């Protein structure tokens, strides 16, 4: 009676069976490629070289991409490169040169990196098929997660996704962040129904570029679906906490809208209003009362569990600079696990965490050998990034040859045309999945301060401070010493803090508060475009703060360092410090504090490195006033 048995299977059961089979296939894929990691890496390198055989870059190196022995020639001849090394080629592509410069396939767009060069976002060329490769890595996440958290197909995910502004290069190619590219692609917008990826946020709300309207719309939809939400998250921990702070500020109006069944007039985007209107579906006083009862309580500890009671975990990146947000997430989460799932960048998507429910301190990413060709530059953990001698490609280590416990800088060769490109991430080998290593993220090279997607190095900070202190000169005041830290504990969003020790002439005119505020703004104006976008457009960083400390503070800081074993002959004041005893020492000697009075200017719509060519894209200057999140 096989026909009768088949007829008795419901469509839902059949779909569930098919989904289980698909998950099993994905997990088998992970097993297969990690077991044969060395073989897969050799295949990937051969494919990349053959696909890009006509690329001018490889021809300049003398690497015959489509000839026998191309891989050996590549290993022998291809140098290590940074973005500055390939910038002339990138600018040629941006300005409209369509010849095969870096890639044998047409460049489809530029992905703007959070890293900067000359104060501007780096432009990473990519090709159309790379989107499919990135989508393939996304497809591995739920099969891995479902092994540890069953039943995720029975509810919804409140994931808060946002797009950022984009523009076109003089040659007509889109330039945008990698996540904006994905959310605007058919892989996201035309995704087939999958019970494991049912989101509370309508696509229209995700695609809205107005930060306030997008956040408001996504949160009200998440609140309406609160009973069905099984997981919450955002890409970065900083973004998720910004959403919780938004809820803390706007819950009365959100509850009012739910109670009335009508969306607040502050959301004006027609597409967003239409999409949210389909979610609201009329007045719901009982739901509004339930949410209000939780939000009105004096303590917001555990608010995520209380507002979304069925939530099983918080899905956010908490490695690297995002680790500073773990205590705040734990406060609001009330014990919910923090799941850190994937490792990716604008250059390439790399791998995933095969144990996503582990403790944040135990997160290790398995690099998937099919994503790109991986190599590793050994790092001397005791060496200074700036003082270390320039490395050579002959010291590179293959994926399958790294050693447990050792630290390496990640180097990638991609299908899109990056060859032995230094990503700048320092990783530590934490274990192995079959033959593929698992890496713990250690740090980003040369980054002193980071709140969100910003990455500010010491040289850039020093140049900005040097320019800002000129405002003090008319009063005879000068800067004796300074340091900085990223304060993510006292404000959401976090902000940069500078500790300044000053010298003023006896009997001189006191420096007015307005001048210190000008100093704050001048520092911000001197930082890179990513920082300024986060401040002016995304509102993901708060106003920069200067804390003026008492005379002799940095002498006491040196005394503290010497008491902890530092050498007096080698000691120099740190330009960046971490929260802890040093910040407590500095805070104990603060005499005055000042904040930037407004946002720095930020222009959307171009990159000065190619705007100066005369074929500028449309530019828009953004200030804080229009995006009061």
Curated annotation (Swiss-Prot):
Induction: By auxin. It comes from the Eukaryota. GO terms for cellular component: cytoplasm. It is an enzyme of class 6 (ligase). Its EC number is 6.3.2.-. Expressed in flowers. Keywords: Ligase. One of its GO terms (molecular function) is acid-amino acid ligase activity. GO terms for biological process: response to auxin; response to light stimulus. Belongs to the IAA-amido conjugating enzyme family. PANTHER family: GH3 DOMAIN-CONTAINING PROTEIN (PTHR31901), INDOLE-3-ACETIC ACID-AMIDO SYNTHETASE GH3.4-RELATED (PTHR31901:SF35). May catalyze the synthesis of indole-3-acetic acid (IAA)-amino acid conjugates, providing a mechanism for the plant to cope with the presence of excess auxin. This is Probable indole-3-acetic acid-amido synthetase GH3.4. The gene is GH3.4.
């Amino acid at each position: 009676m096989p026909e009768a048995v088949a007829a008795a299977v419901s469509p839902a059961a059949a779909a569930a069976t098919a989904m289980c089979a698909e998950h099993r296939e994905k997990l088998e894929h992970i097993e297969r490629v990690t077991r044969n990691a060395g073989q897969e890496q050799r295949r990937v390198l051969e494919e990349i070289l053959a696909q890009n055989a006509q690329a001018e870059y490889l021809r300049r190196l003398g690497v015959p991409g489509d000839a026998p022995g191309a891989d050996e020639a590549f290993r022998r001849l291809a140098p290590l490169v940074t973005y500055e090394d390939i910038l002339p080629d990138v600018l040629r592509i941006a300005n409209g040169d369509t010849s095969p410069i870096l890639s044998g396939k047409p460049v489809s767009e530029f992905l703007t990196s959070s890293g900067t060069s000359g104060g501007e976002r780096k432009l990473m060329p990519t090709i159309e098929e790379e989107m499919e490769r990135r989508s393939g890595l996304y497809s591995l996440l739920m099969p891995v997660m479902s092994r540890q958290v069953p039943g995720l197909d029975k509810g919804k995910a409140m994931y808060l996704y946002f797009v950022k502004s984009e523009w076109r290069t003089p040659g007509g190619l889109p330039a945008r962040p990698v996540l904006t590219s994905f959310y605007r692609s058919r892989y996201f917008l035309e995704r087939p129904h999958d019970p494991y990826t049912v989101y509370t946020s309508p696509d229209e709300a995700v695609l809205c570029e107005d930060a306030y309207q997008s956040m408001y719309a996504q949160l009200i939809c998440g609140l309406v679906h609160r009973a069905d939400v099984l997981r919450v998250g955002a890409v970065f921990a900083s973004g998720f906490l910004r959403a919780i702070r938004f809820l803390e500020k706007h819950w009365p109006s959100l509850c009012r809208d739910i109670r009335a069944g009508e969306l607040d007039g502050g959301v004006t985007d027609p597409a967003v209003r239409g999409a949210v209107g389909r979610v609201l579906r009329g007045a719901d006083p009982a739901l509004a009362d339930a949410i209000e009862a939780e939000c009105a309580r004096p303590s917001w500890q555990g608010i995520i569990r209380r507002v979304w009671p069925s939530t099983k975990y918080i899905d956010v990146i908490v490695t690297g600079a995002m680790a500073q947000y773990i205590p705040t997430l734990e406060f609001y989460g009330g014990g919910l696990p923090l799941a850190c799932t994937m490792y990716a960048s604008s250059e390439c998507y790399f791998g995933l965490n095969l144990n996503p429910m582990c403790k944040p301190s135990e997160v290790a990413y398995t690099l998937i050998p099919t994503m790109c060709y991986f190599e590793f530059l050994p790092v001397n953990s005791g060496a200074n990034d700036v003082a270390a001698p320039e490395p050579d490609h002959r010291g590179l280590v293959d994926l399958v040859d790294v050693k447990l416990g050792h630290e390496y800088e990640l180097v990638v060769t991609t299908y899109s045309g990056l060859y032995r490109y230094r990503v700048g991430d320092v990783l530590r080998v934490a274990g192995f999945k079959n033959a593929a290593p698992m890496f713990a993220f250690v740090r980003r090279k040369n980054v002193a301060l980071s709140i969100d997607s910003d990455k500010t190095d010491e040289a850039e900070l020093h140049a900005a401070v040097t320019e800002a202190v000129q405002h003090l000169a008319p009063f005879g005041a000068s800067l004796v010493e300074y340091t900085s830290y990223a304060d993510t504990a006292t404000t959401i969003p976090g902000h940069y803090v500078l500790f300044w020790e000053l010298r003023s002439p006896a009997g001189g005119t006191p420096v007015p508060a307005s001048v210190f505020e000008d100093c704050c703004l001048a520092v911000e104006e001197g930082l890179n475009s990513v920082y300024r976008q986060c401040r002016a457009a995304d509102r993901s960083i708060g106003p920069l703060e200067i804390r003026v400390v008492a005379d002799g503070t940095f002498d006491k800081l040196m005394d503290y360092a010497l008491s902890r074993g530092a050498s007096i002959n080698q000691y120099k004041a740190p330009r960046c410090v971490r929260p802890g005893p040093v910040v407590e020492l500095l805070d104990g000697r603060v005499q005055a504090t000042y904040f930037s009075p407004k946002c720095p200017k930020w222009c959307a719509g171009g990159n000065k490195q190619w705007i100066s060519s005369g074929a500028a894209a449309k530019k828009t200057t953004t200030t804080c006033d229009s995006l009061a999140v």
